[in-house]
Amino acid sequence: MAFSELLDLVGGLGRFQVLQTMALMVSIMWLCTQSMLENFSAAVPSHRCWAPLLDNSTAQASILGSLSPEALLAISIPPGPNQRPHQCRRFRQPQWQLLDPNATATSWSEADTEPCVDGWVYDRSIFTSTIVAKWNLVCDSHALKPMAQSIYLAGILVGAAACGPASDRFGRRLVLTWSYLQMAVMGTAAAFAPAFPVYCLFRFLLAFAVAGVMMNTGTLLMEWTAARARPLVMTLNSLGFSFGHGLTAAVAYGVRDWTLLQLVVSVPFFLCFLYSWWLAESARWLLTTGRLDWGLQELWRVAAINGKGAVQDTLTPEVLLSAMREELSMGQPPASLGTLLRMPGLRFRTCISTLCWFAFGFTFFGLALDLQALGSNIFLLQMFIGVVDIPAKMGALLLLSHLGRRPTLAASLLLAGLCILANTLVPHEMGALRSALAVLGLGGVGAAFTCITIYSSELFPTVLRMTAVGLGQMAARGGAILGPLVRLLGVHGPWLPLLVYGTVPVLSGLAALLLPETQSLPLPDTIQDVQNQAVKKATHGTLGNSVLKSTQF
């Protein structure tokens, strides 16, 4: 018997799978808080230069008479581009002439100002502390904030490259357990980082482990669940991220100090580390690596949890050995990336699906990690992202079944891109409309993620499927790294980053229309199967055109 029959024997969808899905889904929710954390821990508070007349009590006492704080601000800090107090410059000397009601903007010149040589004063009414205020990541150092986010996302990229081979060699559960511990330790260490480069290093190592959690969570769910239930289980796993957005907003609303917030979202992974020892190692991996005794013990344990303890009498080492031989005989030799890119039809599919993966990572992380640019209440925005993400993903699943893969993916990307582009035309003062369009756009990106995850698996043959999907996921992570850096274009115009974020999914959505439809088609196992599907489609199209021509009056 094949492994799928062994899984049905011990229970492919029972109490064990329910408990396993719940346990892993909890860790995914807390993992999402780490990825979205810097919306709050790295929020940029309102700030201005430190000025003696405003912030030095001795200087204030030397002023004859009494001046209001507004008057002291006017003679100490020049107006900025938005006519509010400048965030990065101050007057070299108090401009007393500005107290004259007849004073104008020409009463002072740029030469009368200087950078914030004595530091900044931050508004602490919303957040008592952020990494931006701690290390002064503003003005000339403002690029360091998106750089820190890109370093975190680069850690996920590097971790994915390392954790995949590690889990194939040492096992899924062992790498997952280590990743939980590494996330807990590195997250806790980041809270006490003495300097910004050290903080970035700890966040990079934390993100390295994030990749291990994401990859091995999905693998364990897939390898312990019957084929008929895998779409449901993987959708629930994906919804863990949706619930994680709401959890992030709730925790950040209650904890306004970045150090404590970093601790609160890191400590739960110590608990995940402890209960991960209960999780079963993948029996499929154990069998294919020759660990028959361990694999038998895990299968017996799962059978007992699922109420099928009697199978121990029939599930013997000989049966396992037979299953392993059959499973290996059914396998096919792996094909290389060169094969994927060498054949024109596969190369075309690879380029477009990779572009769609890139658009997801680039747009989602570019927008979702800078909520301050999308609206005034970032707590509600973070909550709404999770609320909208749930129906977006569920709706995408329904449309994939009824409308088809190609139109659903294209529509999701086009919706996301058009909502983002529309935001470039909305005045900054219309915060509610800007927030609504941004959340709707992110919902479209979430739907596109569901589509491309399923669609890309159906576009490629079995011998190349993991290579193609892995390439797409690498493109998504590469896009995620670039996404935050595009915000630096905002110095040339606040609309420019949104223009880039909106254009990429629109172009990807249009390109997706060129892909073949795979709805109701069997999964191709070989490259020849893909070619046969293309020939059938071309033949069907030719016959269809002939029928239409023959029935015209």
UniProtKB/Swiss-Prot annotation:
Pfam families: MFS_1. GO terms for cellular component: apical plasma membrane; brush border membrane; extracellular exosome; membrane; plasma membrane. It comes from the Eukaryota. Detected in kidney (at protein level). Detected in fetal and adult kidney. Detected in epithelial cells of proximal tubules in renal cortex. It is a multi-pass membrane protein. SUPFAM superfamilies: MFS general substrate transporter. One of its GO terms (biological process) is urate metabolic process. Changing M430T: In RHUC1; reduced urate transport. Glycans are attached at N56, N102. The chain crosses the membrane at residues 9-29, 146-166, 174-194, 195-215, 232-252, 260-280, 351-371, 378-398, 407-427, 435-455, 466-486, 495-515. It catalyses: urate(out) + (S)-lactate(in) = urate(in) + (S)-lactate(out); nicotinate(in) + urate(out) = nicotinate(out) + urate(in); urate(out) + n chloride(in) = urate(in) + n chloride(out); orotate(out) + nicotinate(in) = orotate(in) + nicotinate(out). The modification Phosphothreonine is found at T542. Changing G164S: In RHUC1; reduced urate transport. Changing Q382L: In RHUC1; strongly reduced urate transport. GO terms for molecular function: PDZ domain binding; urate transmembrane transporter activity. It is found in: Apical cell membrane. Belongs to the major facilitator (TC 2.A.1) superfamily. Organic cation transporter (TC 2.A.1.19) family. Interacts with PDZK1. It is linked to Hypouricemia renal 1: A disorder characterized by impaired uric acid reabsorption at the apical membrane of proximal renal tubule cells, and high urinary urate excretion. Patients often appear asymptomatic, but may be subject to exercise-induced acute renal failure, chronic renal dysfunction and nephrolithiasis. Electroneutral antiporter that translocates urate across the apical membrane of proximal tubular cells in exchange for monovalent organic or inorganic anions. Involved in renal reabsorption of urate and helps maintaining blood levels of uric acid. Mediates urate uptake by an exchange with organic anions such as (S)-lactate and nicotinate, and inorganic anion Cl(-). Other inorganic anions such as Br(-), I(-) and NO3(-) may also act as counteranions that exchange for urate. This is Solute carrier family 22 member 12. The gene is SLC22A12.
